[in-house]
Amino acid sequence: MPAPSAIYPSLNGKNVLITGGAEGIGAATVERFALQGCQVIILDIARDLAQKTIEHVMSLADKTGIWPSTIMAPVFYYCDVSNLSEVQTTTSEILRKYGTVHVLVNNAALTGHKARLSTEEVTSEAWDMNINTSLRHVFFLTQAVIPGMKHAGGGSIVNLGSITWRIPDPAVPVYGACKAAVMGLTRAQSKELGPFNIRINSVMPGAIATQRQRDEVLTPEYRAEVMRSQSLQRDLVPEDVAKVIVFLASDEASGITGSSYVVDGGWCSDP
């Protein structure tokens, strides 16, 4: 990969915590922050995929020509975000070791076939799994990093939403409800924490051609539906989303909070 398309000096040396950073949008975001000179911390359950992401990032260090001496290897912490106790224990360990988390990216969510359940198919167990994996940890990770951000004079939190609740997508009613709730959290907490210079924004991806989506969801029929719905006639890729996340975390976006940025190729056609 070439050097990042935009360099944000304000991010150099910052600690960035990314959930679900082993693959897909998360992995692309790990790469983008690492190339900005950040210490990236990955929370995920996919240890092997996380290691591949870390190795890939480090293979780029000599190819960018941008701050080669400050590209730090991302670090991985095994954490099942659906397990609140595990989230809290792991976060406490990270905060003890790294101090302040300057940027939090709440990306992890239940996706693929596990999230594609109709209303009649959703059991109480499936409901809890969706809520715990796609929503609950967003609140409690934010809660955990707030004290350090306040002490540091501010910080940035980027929550990953989705256009599924805006379309709306009847195939994922619980997932859509979780992502609508993420929007509500973003708006409420941005008001609550703005006085402390903590900015909270969300990014709402559309149909992003991650490897998991290609393997599980992006059939020729579904891709044809995506192309009919999008204005842009190309597959959107994880890097399209990652670039927006990094911008929102930087000081270039210092006046932006409580906002949602849609990356959907024109599917919704409004903010």
Predicted region positions:
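Residue(s) in the substrate-gating loop at a strand-loop-helix junction
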Residues: 162
